[in-house]
Amino acid sequence: MNNNDLVAKLWKLCDNLRDGGVSYQNYVNELASLLFLKMCKETGQEADYLPEGYRWDDLKSRIGQDQMQFYRNLLVQLGSDEKKLVQAVFHNVSTTIEQPKQLTELVSYMDALDWYNGNHGKSRDDFGDMYEGLLQKNANETKSGAGQYFTPRPLIKTIIHLLKPQPREVVQDPAAGTAGFLIEADRYVKSQTNDLDDLDGDTQDFQIHRAFIGLELVPGTRRLALMNCLLHDIEGNLDHGGAIRLGNTLGSDGENLPKAHIVATNPPFGSAAGTNITRTFVHPTSNKQLCFMQHIIETLHPGGRAAVVVPDNVLFEGGKGTDIRRDLMDKCHLHTILRLPTGIFYAQGVKTNVLFFTKGTVTNPHQDKNCTDDVWVYDLRTNMPSFGKRTPFTEQHLQPFETVYGEDPHGLSPREEGEWSFNAEESEVADSEENKNTDQHQATSRWRKFSREWIRSAKSDSLDISWLKDKDSIDADSLPEPDVLAAEAMGELVQALGELDALMRELGAGDEADAQRQLLNEAFGEVKA
Protein backbone atom coordinates (compact mmCIF):
# COMPACT_ATOMS: atom_id res chain seq x y z
CA MET A 1 0.00 0.00 0.00
CA ASN A 2 1.51 3.35 -1.02
CA ASN A 3 1.49 6.50 1.05
CA ASN A 4 -1.43 8.06 -0.83
CA ASP A 5 -3.55 5.02 -0.02
CA LEU A 6 -2.53 5.18 3.64
CA VAL A 7 -3.40 8.86 3.82
CA ALA A 8 -6.79 8.25 2.21
CA LYS A 9 -7.60 5.40 4.61
CA LEU A 10 -6.47 7.27 7.71
CA TRP A 11 -8.44 10.33 6.63
CA LYS A 12 -11.54 8.26 5.96
CA LEU A 13 -11.39 7.07 9.55
CA CYS A 14 -11.56 10.70 10.65
CA ASP A 15 -15.10 10.92 9.30
CA ASN A 16 -16.12 8.24 11.79
CA LEU A 17 -14.44 10.07 14.66
CA ARG A 18 -16.04 13.38 13.72
CA ASP A 19 -19.37 11.90 14.81
CA GLY A 20 -17.84 11.85 18.28
CA GLY A 21 -16.89 15.52 18.15
CA VAL A 22 -13.28 15.15 16.98
CA SER A 23 -12.37 17.95 14.57
CA TYR A 24 -9.96 17.61 11.65
CA GLN A 25 -7.34 19.60 13.55
CA ASN A 26 -7.74 17.45 16.67
CA TYR A 27 -7.59 14.32 14.54
CA VAL A 28 -4.23 15.33 13.07
CA ASN A 29 -2.95 16.04 16.58
CA GLU A 30 -4.22 12.66 17.75
CA LEU A 31 -2.51 10.94 14.84
CA ALA A 32 0.75 12.72 15.67
CA SER A 33 0.84 10.98 19.05
CA LEU A 34 -0.11 7.57 17.70
CA LEU A 35 2.14 7.82 14.64
CA PHE A 36 5.11 8.59 16.85
CA LEU A 37 4.50 5.40 18.84
CA LYS A 38 3.90 3.38 15.67
CA MET A 39 6.96 4.84 13.91
CA CYS A 40 9.20 3.84 16.82
CA LYS A 41 7.73 0.33 16.70
CA GLU A 42 8.04 -0.13 12.93
CA THR A 43 11.57 1.30 12.65
CA GLY A 44 12.95 -0.51 15.71
CA GLN A 45 13.66 2.69 17.62
CA GLU A 46 11.46 2.25 20.68
CA ALA A 47 14.46 1.89 22.98
CA ASP A 48 15.89 5.17 21.63
CA TYR A 49 12.83 7.24 22.44
CA LEU A 50 10.27 5.52 24.64
CA PRO A 51 10.48 4.19 28.21
CA GLU A 52 9.52 0.59 28.77
CA GLY A 53 5.84 0.13 29.43
CA TYR A 54 4.80 3.10 27.28
CA ARG A 55 5.12 1.72 23.78
CA TRP A 56 2.83 0.73 20.91
CA ASP A 57 2.27 -2.87 22.00
CA ASP A 58 1.47 -1.71 25.53
CA LEU A 59 -1.29 0.48 24.11
CA LYS A 60 -2.50 -2.06 21.56
CA SER A 61 -2.83 -4.86 24.11
CA ARG A 62 -5.52 -2.98 26.03
CA ILE A 63 -9.13 -2.31 25.09
CA GLY A 64 -12.04 -0.23 26.29
CA GLN A 65 -11.78 1.99 29.35
CA ASP A 66 -8.49 0.38 30.39
CA GLN A 67 -6.91 1.40 27.08
CA MET A 68 -8.38 4.89 27.33
CA GLN A 69 -6.95 5.47 30.80
CA PHE A 70 -3.58 4.01 29.82
CA TYR A 71 -3.43 6.30 26.78
CA ARG A 72 -4.11 9.37 28.93
CA ASN A 73 -1.40 8.31 31.38
CA LEU A 74 1.00 7.64 28.51
CA LEU A 75 0.57 11.17 27.17
CA VAL A 76 1.27 12.63 30.61
CA GLN A 77 4.29 10.38 31.13
CA LEU A 78 5.87 11.20 27.76
CA GLY A 79 5.13 14.90 28.25
CA SER A 80 7.47 14.87 31.24
CA ASP A 81 10.01 12.45 29.79
CA GLU A 82 13.69 13.09 30.54
CA LYS A 83 14.43 13.17 26.81
CA LYS A 84 13.80 16.79 25.81
CA LEU A 85 12.78 15.88 22.28
CA VAL A 86 10.09 13.43 23.42
CA GLN A 87 9.01 15.93 26.07
CA ALA A 88 8.64 18.64 23.40
CA VAL A 89 6.51 16.40 21.17
CA PHE A 90 4.14 15.44 24.00
CA HIS A 91 4.24 18.63 26.10
CA ASN A 92 0.76 19.57 27.37
CA VAL A 93 -0.83 17.05 25.00
CA SER A 94 -4.16 15.51 25.90
CA THR A 95 -6.56 13.40 23.92
CA THR A 96 -9.79 14.81 22.52
CA ILE A 97 -11.23 11.32 22.04
CA GLU A 98 -13.90 10.78 24.67
CA GLN A 99 -15.30 7.38 23.72
CA PRO A 100 -13.02 4.37 24.43
CA LYS A 101 -14.41 2.46 21.46
CA GLN A 102 -13.19 5.22 19.12
CA LEU A 103 -9.65 4.97 20.46
CA THR A 104 -9.73 1.18 20.15
CA GLU A 105 -10.99 1.51 16.59
CA LEU A 106 -8.23 3.98 15.68
CA VAL A 107 -5.43 1.92 17.26
CA SER A 108 -6.71 -1.31 15.70
CA TYR A 109 -7.08 0.33 12.31
CA MET A 110 -3.56 1.77 12.39
CA ASP A 111 -2.13 -1.54 13.55
CA ALA A 112 -3.83 -3.45 10.73
CA LEU A 113 -2.66 -1.17 7.92
CA ASP A 114 0.03 -2.47 5.58
CA TRP A 115 3.02 -0.49 6.81
CA TYR A 116 5.45 -2.48 4.70
CA ASN A 117 6.55 -2.33 1.08
CA GLY A 118 7.41 -5.86 0.06
CA ASN A 119 9.92 -7.32 2.49
CA HIS A 120 11.29 -3.95 3.55
CA GLY A 121 9.95 -2.03 6.51
CA LYS A 122 8.98 1.55 6.00
CA SER A 123 11.69 4.11 6.66
CA ARG A 124 11.14 7.22 8.75
CA ASP A 125 10.89 9.21 5.53
CA ASP A 126 7.99 7.02 4.40
CA PHE A 127 6.17 7.83 7.61
CA GLY A 128 7.09 11.47 7.11
CA ASP A 129 5.70 11.63 3.59
CA MET A 130 2.47 10.10 4.80
CA TYR A 131 2.26 12.57 7.68
CA GLU A 132 2.84 15.50 5.32
CA GLY A 133 -0.04 14.19 3.27
CA LEU A 134 -2.25 14.34 6.35
CA LEU A 135 -1.12 17.90 7.10
CA GLN A 136 -2.01 18.88 3.53
CA LYS A 137 -5.40 17.22 3.92
CA ASN A 138 -5.99 19.15 7.12
CA ALA A 139 -5.11 22.42 5.40
CA ASN A 140 -7.50 21.58 2.55
CA GLU A 141 -10.35 20.82 4.91
CA THR A 142 -9.98 23.53 7.54
CA LYS A 143 -9.09 26.57 5.41
CA SER A 144 -8.83 28.58 8.58
CA GLY A 145 -6.20 29.48 11.14
CA ALA A 146 -2.77 28.37 9.97
CA GLY A 147 -4.34 26.25 7.24
CA GLN A 148 -5.44 29.25 5.20
CA TYR A 149 -1.79 30.22 4.67
CA PHE A 150 -0.45 26.70 4.14
CA THR A 151 2.36 27.13 1.63
CA PRO A 152 1.62 25.05 -1.50
CA ARG A 153 4.00 22.13 -1.90
CA PRO A 154 4.91 22.98 -5.54
CA LEU A 155 6.02 26.46 -4.46
CA ILE A 156 8.11 25.09 -1.58
CA LYS A 157 9.75 22.59 -3.91
CA THR A 158 10.59 25.25 -6.51
CA ILE A 159 12.04 27.65 -3.94
CA ILE A 160 14.30 25.00 -2.43
CA HIS A 161 15.34 23.72 -5.85
CA LEU A 162 16.43 27.25 -6.80
CA LEU A 163 18.24 27.95 -3.51
CA LYS A 164 20.11 24.62 -3.73
CA PRO A 165 21.03 23.94 -0.08
CA GLN A 166 24.35 22.16 0.35
CA PRO A 167 25.72 19.85 3.07
CA ARG A 168 26.90 21.72 6.18
CA GLU A 169 24.76 24.76 5.37
CA VAL A 170 22.34 25.94 8.06
CA VAL A 171 18.81 26.37 6.73
CA GLN A 172 16.47 28.50 8.85
CA ASP A 173 12.73 29.12 8.73
CA PRO A 174 11.79 31.81 11.29
CA ALA A 175 8.07 31.18 10.70
CA ALA A 176 8.27 27.40 10.53
CA GLY A 177 4.60 26.42 10.44
CA THR A 178 4.62 22.65 9.96
CA ALA A 179 8.25 22.75 8.70
CA GLY A 180 7.53 22.32 4.98
CA PHE A 181 10.55 24.36 3.83
CA LEU A 182 12.95 22.53 6.16
CA ILE A 183 11.65 19.11 5.13
CA GLU A 184 12.05 19.97 1.45
CA ALA A 185 15.57 21.32 2.04
CA ASP A 186 16.50 18.06 3.76
CA ARG A 187 14.96 16.10 0.91
CA TYR A 188 16.99 18.11 -1.62
CA VAL A 189 20.31 17.51 0.18
CA LYS A 190 19.55 13.81 0.49
CA SER A 191 18.79 13.61 -3.24
CA GLN A 192 22.22 15.08 -4.00
CA THR A 193 24.16 12.88 -1.56
CA ASN A 194 22.72 9.38 -1.99
CA ASP A 195 20.53 9.80 1.08
CA LEU A 196 23.54 11.24 2.99
CA ASP A 197 25.57 8.05 2.39
CA ASP A 198 28.13 9.98 0.31
CA LEU A 199 28.93 12.19 3.31
CA ASP A 200 31.40 11.48 6.11
CA GLY A 201 30.06 10.64 9.56
CA ASP A 202 30.54 14.10 11.02
CA THR A 203 28.67 15.75 8.15
CA GLN A 204 25.87 13.21 8.41
CA ASP A 205 25.53 14.06 12.09
CA PHE A 206 25.50 17.77 11.20
CA GLN A 207 22.65 17.23 8.75
CA ILE A 208 20.57 15.35 11.31
CA HIS A 209 21.19 17.58 14.32
CA ARG A 210 22.34 21.05 13.22
CA ALA A 211 21.52 21.79 9.58
CA PHE A 212 17.84 22.69 9.97
CA ILE A 213 16.29 25.06 12.47
CA GLY A 214 12.89 26.68 12.71
CA LEU A 215 11.02 28.91 15.11
CA GLU A 216 7.27 28.66 15.61
CA LEU A 217 5.06 30.83 17.81
CA VAL A 218 2.06 28.50 18.22
CA PRO A 219 2.67 25.47 20.50
CA GLY A 220 0.26 23.16 18.67
CA THR A 221 1.75 23.98 15.28
CA ARG A 222 5.27 23.58 16.66
CA ARG A 223 4.34 20.10 17.82
CA LEU A 224 3.13 19.14 14.35
CA ALA A 225 6.35 20.55 12.89
CA LEU A 226 8.51 18.61 15.34
CA MET A 227 6.65 15.46 14.47
CA ASN A 228 7.11 16.17 10.77
CA CYS A 229 10.86 16.65 11.25
CA LEU A 230 11.27 13.53 13.36
CA LEU A 231 9.44 11.41 10.82
CA HIS A 232 11.91 12.68 8.20
CA ASP A 233 14.93 11.83 10.37
CA ILE A 234 15.62 15.45 11.31
CA GLU A 235 16.24 15.40 15.04
CA GLY A 236 17.71 18.87 15.41
CA ASN A 237 19.46 20.16 18.50
CA LEU A 238 18.35 17.81 21.27
CA ASP A 239 19.27 20.36 23.95
CA HIS A 240 16.67 22.73 22.47
CA GLY A 241 13.99 20.07 22.12
CA GLY A 242 14.44 19.39 18.42
CA ALA A 243 14.74 21.23 15.12
CA ILE A 244 11.76 23.51 15.78
CA ARG A 245 12.02 25.88 18.72
CA LEU A 246 9.00 27.45 20.37
CA GLY A 247 9.16 31.22 20.46
CA ASN A 248 8.63 34.61 18.90
CA THR A 249 10.90 35.60 16.02
CA LEU A 250 10.06 39.24 16.63
CA GLY A 251 11.39 39.01 20.19
CA SER A 252 14.53 37.71 21.89
CA ASP A 253 13.89 34.18 20.57
CA GLY A 254 14.56 35.40 17.05
CA GLU A 255 17.74 37.18 18.11
CA ASN A 256 19.01 33.95 19.68
CA LEU A 257 18.65 31.88 16.51
CA PRO A 258 21.99 30.84 15.00
CA LYS A 259 23.06 32.58 11.79
CA ALA A 260 21.92 30.87 8.61
CA HIS A 261 23.34 30.26 5.15
CA ILE A 262 19.81 29.95 3.77
CA VAL A 263 16.47 31.36 4.90
CA ALA A 264 13.32 30.03 3.23
CA THR A 265 10.10 31.17 4.82
CA ASN A 266 6.50 32.30 4.49
CA PRO A 267 5.87 34.68 7.42
CA PRO A 268 2.26 34.96 8.62
CA PHE A 269 0.09 37.47 6.78
CA GLY A 270 -2.05 40.13 8.40
CA SER A 271 -1.61 42.88 10.96
CA ALA A 272 0.57 42.76 14.05
CA ALA A 273 -2.43 42.24 16.33
CA GLY A 274 -1.64 39.42 18.74
CA THR A 275 2.06 39.53 17.93
CA ASN A 276 4.30 40.98 20.61
CA ILE A 277 7.11 42.84 18.82
CA THR A 278 9.65 43.29 21.60
CA ARG A 279 12.78 43.23 19.50
CA THR A 280 14.64 46.42 18.58
CA PHE A 281 14.93 46.67 14.80
CA VAL A 282 16.82 49.30 12.82
CA HIS A 283 13.49 50.45 11.37
CA PRO A 284 10.79 50.04 14.07
CA THR A 285 7.36 49.24 12.63
CA SER A 286 4.15 47.51 13.66
CA ASN A 287 4.02 45.68 10.31
CA LYS A 288 5.18 42.19 11.21
CA GLN A 289 6.05 41.18 7.64
CA LEU A 290 8.46 44.12 7.46
CA CYS A 291 9.89 43.07 10.84
CA PHE A 292 10.42 39.56 9.49
CA MET A 293 12.27 41.04 6.52
CA GLN A 294 14.63 42.84 8.89
CA HIS A 295 15.19 39.64 10.88
CA ILE A 296 16.09 37.75 7.72
CA ILE A 297 18.63 40.35 6.63
CA GLU A 298 20.19 40.25 10.11
CA THR A 299 20.20 36.46 10.51
CA LEU A 300 21.86 35.64 7.17
CA HIS A 301 25.57 34.91 7.03
CA PRO A 302 27.43 37.22 4.62
CA GLY A 303 26.86 35.65 1.21
CA GLY A 304 23.81 33.79 2.50
CA ARG A 305 20.73 33.49 0.30
CA ALA A 306 17.03 33.83 1.01
CA ALA A 307 13.61 33.33 -0.53
CA VAL A 308 10.72 34.98 1.32
CA VAL A 309 6.99 34.88 0.56
CA VAL A 310 5.52 38.33 1.21
CA PRO A 311 2.14 39.99 0.58
CA ASP A 312 1.92 42.91 -1.85
CA ASN A 313 1.95 45.55 0.88
CA VAL A 314 5.60 44.76 1.66
CA LEU A 315 6.44 45.88 -1.88
CA PHE A 316 4.73 49.27 -1.75
CA GLU A 317 4.11 50.38 1.86
CA GLY A 318 5.54 53.84 2.48
CA GLY A 319 7.41 55.29 5.44
CA LYS A 320 9.31 52.54 7.24
CA GLY A 321 8.41 50.17 4.42
CA THR A 322 10.37 52.29 1.97
CA ASP A 323 13.29 52.48 4.40
CA ILE A 324 13.36 48.71 4.79
CA ARG A 325 13.25 48.10 1.03
CA ARG A 326 16.14 50.54 0.56
CA ASP A 327 18.03 48.74 3.31
CA LEU A 328 17.33 45.42 1.59
CA MET A 329 18.60 46.66 -1.78
CA ASP A 330 21.63 48.26 -0.14
CA LYS A 331 22.76 45.37 2.07
CA CYS A 332 21.59 42.55 -0.19
CA HIS A 333 21.59 41.69 -3.86
CA LEU A 334 17.85 41.53 -4.54
CA HIS A 335 17.98 39.79 -7.89
CA THR A 336 14.54 38.22 -8.47
CA ILE A 337 10.88 38.82 -7.67
CA LEU A 338 8.23 36.22 -8.49
CA ARG A 339 4.68 37.62 -8.60
CA LEU A 340 2.50 34.71 -7.52
CA PRO A 341 -1.02 34.05 -8.79
CA THR A 342 -3.99 34.62 -6.52
CA GLY A 343 -5.86 31.64 -5.13
CA ILE A 344 -2.87 29.41 -4.35
CA PHE A 345 -3.30 30.08 -0.63
CA TYR A 346 -6.51 29.01 1.05
CA ALA A 347 -7.16 32.58 2.13
CA GLN A 348 -8.66 33.63 -1.18
CA GLY A 349 -7.67 36.99 -2.57
CA VAL A 350 -4.28 37.14 -0.85
CA LYS A 351 -1.75 38.54 -3.33
CA THR A 352 1.79 37.39 -2.70
CA ASN A 353 5.30 37.42 -4.11
CA VAL A 354 8.61 35.67 -3.51
CA LEU A 355 11.72 37.81 -3.01
CA PHE A 356 15.04 36.11 -3.81
CA PHE A 357 18.20 37.79 -2.53
CA THR A 358 21.79 37.28 -1.37
CA LYS A 359 23.29 39.11 1.61
CA GLY A 360 26.11 41.26 0.28
CA THR A 361 27.29 40.14 -3.14
CA VAL A 362 28.92 36.96 -4.38
CA THR A 363 32.17 38.80 -5.10
CA ASN A 364 32.08 40.62 -1.74
CA PRO A 365 29.81 38.94 0.83
CA HIS A 366 30.55 41.67 3.39
CA GLN A 367 29.47 44.51 1.08
CA ASP A 368 26.66 46.51 2.71
CA LYS A 369 26.10 49.34 0.22
CA ASN A 370 24.71 49.33 -3.34
CA CYS A 371 24.49 45.53 -3.52
CA THR A 372 21.49 45.52 -5.88
CA ASP A 373 21.97 46.42 -9.54
CA ASP A 374 19.24 44.83 -11.66
CA VAL A 375 16.03 43.26 -10.37
CA TRP A 376 14.37 40.61 -12.54
CA VAL A 377 10.61 40.21 -12.19
CA TYR A 378 8.51 37.24 -13.34
CA ASP A 379 4.76 37.90 -13.53
CA LEU A 380 2.97 34.63 -12.82
CA ARG A 381 -0.16 36.48 -11.69
CA THR A 382 -1.66 38.49 -14.54
CA ASN A 383 -4.17 36.59 -16.68
CA MET A 384 -3.47 33.29 -14.94
CA PRO A 385 -6.25 30.80 -14.12
CA SER A 386 -8.21 31.01 -10.90
CA PHE A 387 -6.51 28.30 -8.87
CA GLY A 388 -8.34 26.08 -6.41
CA LYS A 389 -9.53 22.50 -6.04
CA ARG A 390 -10.77 22.35 -9.62
CA THR A 391 -7.65 23.98 -11.05
CA PRO A 392 -4.78 22.96 -8.76
CA PHE A 393 -1.51 24.90 -8.73
CA THR A 394 1.20 22.50 -9.86
CA GLU A 395 4.94 22.33 -10.53
CA GLN A 396 4.20 22.75 -14.24
CA HIS A 397 2.98 26.29 -13.60
CA LEU A 398 6.34 27.14 -12.03
CA GLN A 399 8.53 25.40 -14.61
CA PRO A 400 8.90 28.40 -16.99
CA PHE A 401 10.03 30.55 -14.06
CA GLU A 402 12.56 27.92 -12.96
CA THR A 403 13.95 27.84 -16.49
CA VAL A 404 14.54 31.59 -16.77
CA TYR A 405 15.84 31.80 -13.18
CA GLY A 406 18.73 29.54 -14.13
CA GLU A 407 20.96 27.13 -12.24
CA ASP A 408 22.90 29.65 -10.16
CA PRO A 409 21.32 29.87 -6.66
CA HIS A 410 22.42 33.51 -6.36
CA GLY A 411 20.52 34.47 -9.50
CA LEU A 412 23.70 35.01 -11.53
CA SER A 413 22.99 32.66 -14.43
CA PRO A 414 22.91 34.36 -17.85
CA ARG A 415 19.45 35.86 -18.34
CA GLU A 416 17.54 37.44 -21.19
CA GLU A 417 14.22 39.26 -21.08
CA GLY A 418 11.33 37.57 -22.80
CA GLU A 419 9.14 34.63 -21.69
CA TRP A 420 5.61 34.25 -23.02
CA SER A 421 4.14 31.21 -21.25
CA PHE A 422 0.43 30.92 -20.49
CA ASN A 423 -0.60 33.03 -23.51
CA ALA A 424 1.19 36.12 -22.25
CA GLU A 425 1.53 37.48 -25.79
CA GLU A 426 -2.27 37.89 -25.88
CA SER A 427 -2.20 40.25 -22.89
CA GLU A 428 -2.73 43.95 -23.26
CA VAL A 429 0.04 46.25 -22.12
CA ALA A 430 -0.68 48.54 -19.18
CA ASP A 431 -0.16 52.28 -19.51
CA SER A 432 2.52 52.47 -16.82
CA GLU A 433 6.06 53.58 -16.07
CA GLU A 434 7.20 50.00 -16.59
CA ASN A 435 6.29 50.18 -20.30
CA LYS A 436 7.73 53.57 -21.24
CA ASN A 437 10.22 53.26 -24.09
CA THR A 438 9.68 49.49 -24.19
CA ASP A 439 9.21 47.39 -27.30
CA GLN A 440 5.54 46.33 -27.59
CA HIS A 441 6.35 42.63 -27.94
CA GLN A 442 8.81 42.73 -25.07
CA ALA A 443 6.19 44.47 -22.94
CA THR A 444 3.94 41.39 -23.16
CA SER A 445 6.67 39.15 -21.73
CA ARG A 446 6.30 37.72 -18.25
CA TRP A 447 10.05 38.12 -17.60
CA ARG A 448 11.48 41.63 -17.38
CA LYS A 449 14.53 43.41 -15.95
CA PHE A 450 14.50 46.73 -14.07
CA SER A 451 17.58 48.63 -12.95
CA ARG A 452 18.14 49.80 -9.39
CA GLU A 453 18.31 53.38 -10.67
CA TRP A 454 14.94 53.02 -12.43
CA ILE A 455 13.37 51.62 -9.25
CA ARG A 456 14.70 54.62 -7.35
CA SER A 457 13.72 57.32 -9.83
CA ALA A 458 10.54 55.96 -11.42
CA LYS A 459 9.06 53.98 -8.51
CA SER A 460 10.46 55.84 -5.47
CA ASP A 461 11.79 52.48 -4.27
CA SER A 462 8.47 50.70 -4.53
CA LEU A 463 8.90 47.11 -5.72
CA ASP A 464 5.28 46.80 -6.82
CA ILE A 465 6.32 46.33 -10.44
CA SER A 466 3.74 45.21 -13.02
CA TRP A 467 3.32 45.88 -16.71
CA LEU A 468 0.67 43.49 -18.06
CA LYS A 469 -3.00 44.48 -18.05
CA ASP A 470 -5.35 42.01 -16.42
CA LYS A 471 -8.13 41.13 -18.85
CA ASP A 472 -10.61 41.03 -15.94
CA SER A 473 -9.61 44.42 -14.58
CA ILE A 474 -12.25 47.14 -14.55
CA ASP A 475 -11.60 50.62 -15.85
CA ALA A 476 -12.48 52.97 -12.98
CA ASP A 477 -13.63 55.64 -15.44
CA SER A 478 -16.39 53.37 -16.73
CA LEU A 479 -17.86 52.54 -13.32
CA PRO A 480 -21.30 53.92 -12.32
CA GLU A 481 -21.57 56.65 -9.71
CA PRO A 482 -20.99 55.50 -6.09
CA ASP A 483 -24.64 56.02 -5.11
CA VAL A 484 -25.73 53.73 -7.96
CA LEU A 485 -23.24 51.03 -6.92
CA ALA A 486 -24.38 51.31 -3.29
CA ALA A 487 -28.04 51.00 -4.29
CA GLU A 488 -27.31 47.91 -6.41
CA ALA A 489 -25.41 46.30 -3.53
CA MET A 490 -28.21 47.07 -1.07
CA GLY A 491 -30.77 45.60 -3.46
CA GLU A 492 -28.81 42.36 -3.77
CA LEU A 493 -28.44 42.13 0.02
CA VAL A 494 -32.18 42.65 0.56
CA GLN A 495 -32.96 39.91 -1.96
CA ALA A 496 -30.48 37.54 -0.32
CA LEU A 497 -31.90 38.23 3.14
CA GLY A 498 -35.39 37.53 1.87
CA GLU A 499 -34.29 34.19 0.44
CA LEU A 500 -32.55 33.26 3.71
CA ASP A 501 -35.68 34.18 5.68
CA ALA A 502 -37.80 31.93 3.47
CA LEU A 503 -35.29 29.08 3.76
CA MET A 504 -35.20 29.28 7.57
CA ARG A 505 -39.00 29.12 7.73
CA GLU A 506 -39.00 26.15 5.35
CA LEU A 507 -36.56 24.41 7.69
CA GLY A 508 -38.84 25.02 10.66
CA ALA A 509 -36.76 27.82 12.16
CA GLY A 510 -39.44 30.50 11.99
CA ASP A 511 -38.81 31.74 15.53
CA GLU A 512 -35.12 32.25 14.80
CA ALA A 513 -36.02 34.02 11.54
CA ASP A 514 -38.33 36.38 13.46
CA ALA A 515 -35.56 37.08 15.97
CA GLN A 516 -33.10 37.90 13.21
CA ARG A 517 -35.64 40.16 11.52
CA GLN A 518 -36.13 42.01 14.81
CA LEU A 519 -32.37 42.54 15.07
CA LEU A 520 -32.36 44.03 11.58
CA ASN A 521 -35.21 46.35 12.50
CA GLU A 522 -33.32 47.52 15.57
CA ALA A 523 -30.13 48.01 13.57
CA PHE A 524 -31.64 50.03 10.74
CA GLY A 525 -34.85 51.37 12.24
CA GLU A 526 -38.19 49.93 11.15
CA VAL A 527 -39.41 51.55 7.94
CA LYS A 528 -42.94 52.90 8.43
CA ALA A 529 -45.38 54.05 5.78
From Swiss-Prot:
EC number in record: 2.1.1.72
GO biological process, one term: methylation
Ribosomal protein as UniProt keyword: no
PROSITE patterns per the UniProt record, alphabetical: N6_MTASE
Biased composition (Basic and acidic residues): 407-418
Catalytic activity: a 2'-deoxyadenosine in DNA + S-adenosyl-L-methionine = an N(6)-methyl-2'-deoxyadenosine in DNA + S-adenosyl-L-homocysteine + H(+)
Region feature (Disordered): 405-444
Class in the EC hierarchy, top level: transferase
A family per Pfam: N6_Mtase
Sorted UniProt keywords: DNA-binding, Methyltransferase, Restriction system, S-adenosyl-L-methionine, Transferase
GO function terms (MF aspect): DNA binding; N-methyltransferase activity; site-specific DNA-methyltransferase (adenine-specific) activity
InterPro entries for the chain: D12N6_MeTrfase_N, DNA_Adenine_Mtase, DNA_methylase_A-5, DNA_methylase_N6_adenine_CS, SAM-dependent_MTases_sf, T1MK-like_N_sf
Domain of life: Bacteria
Binding site for S-adenosyl-L-methionine: 148-153, 178-180, 216
Function recorded in the entry: The subtype gamma methyltransferase (M) subunit of a type I restriction enzyme. The M and S subunits together form a methyltransferase (MTase) that methylates two adenine residues of the sequence 5'-GAGN(6)GTRC-3'. In the presence of the R subunit the complex can also act as an endonuclease, binding to the same target sequence but cutting the DNA some distance from this site. Whether the DNA is cut or modified depends on the methylation state of the target sequence. When the target site is unmodified, the DNA is cut.
Further facts: Type I restriction and modification enzymes are complex, multifunctional systems which require ATP, S-adenosyl methionine and Mg(2+) as cofactors and, in addition to their endonucleolytic and methylase activities, are potent DNA-dependent ATPases.
Annotated family: Belongs to the N(4)/N(6)-methyltransferase family.
PANTHER family noted in UniProt: SLR6095 PROTEIN, TYPE I RESTRICTION ENZYME ECOKI METHYLASE SUBUNIT
Assembly and binders: The type I restriction/modification system is composed of three polypeptides R, M and S; the restriction enzyme has stoichiometry R(2)M(2)S(1) while the methyltransferase is M(2)S(1).
Identification of the protein by name: Type I restriction enzyme StySJI methylase subunit
Lineage: Bacteria, Pseudomonadati, Pseudomonadota, Gammaproteobacteria, Enterobacterales
